Design a protein with these regions (language model features):
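Membrane-spanning alpha-helical segments of multipass transporters and channels
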Residues: 1-4, 9-179
């Protein structure tokens, strides 16, 4: 045993440049969701500026503002990560698409809960964020979590944004299954 040490052979199936690139999918998803919560806390989604003709026009007036901020947030985040931090996704267009969709989904979910439950909705979204932090498989494979988090994993939006980002930043696969 001592005379014949074990020789290992390491094979990297999805190499990434550094730990920051490996954590970027998780932190980008978290940033977009936290941004959606913050935006909904600051922007009054209840009081219309002008009295709307119907519910659809009221919704369109509110979601357009929230989506515009989400688009700005997405563009700023991707630009800074690429230009300042040196993030090198396989496709910048697909990265922007995933970021914009993630921002829109986050804003929509948070807005829905704020509309249904008022300020309690923001609190529920904080709890939902905590569940997503643990159940999305962002830091460690979900198989290392307990059965509760494995059970909720497929139902969490961050699960899919994190996987799509991983495809773009390291694996090089398709994002179509995550959209």
């Amino acid at each position: 045993m001592m005379a014949e040490p074990v020789i290992t052979n390491q094979i990297e199936t999805a190499p990434v440049a550094n730990n920051g690139t490996a954590m970027a999918p998780y932190m980008m998803s978290v940033a977009l969701f936290v941004g959606a919560i913050s935006l909904n806390l600051m922007y009054d989604i209840f009081t219309p500026r002008n009295y709307p003709k119907n519910g659809r026009s009221w919704w369109a007036s509110k979601i357009s503002v929230l989506s515009a901020v989400g688009i700005c947030q997405s563009l700023i985040m991707v630009t800074l990560l690429v230009k300042v931090n040196g993030l090198a996704p396989s496709s910048i267009d697909k990265t922007l698409l995933v970021t914009l969709l993630t921002a829109f989904v986050s804003v929509s979910i948070v807005m829905l809960f704020n509309l249904l439950f008022d300020k309690v909705g923001s609190f529920l979204m904080l709890i939902f964020l905590i569940l997503q932090l643990s159940g999305s498989g962002g830091t460690y494979p979900i198989q290392l979590s307990n059965s509760f988090f494995e059970a909720i994993h497929p139902y969490l939006p961050m699960t899919y944004s994190i996987d799509a980002y991983r495809q773009l930043f390291g694996i090089g696969g398709s994002i179509s299954m995550d959209l």
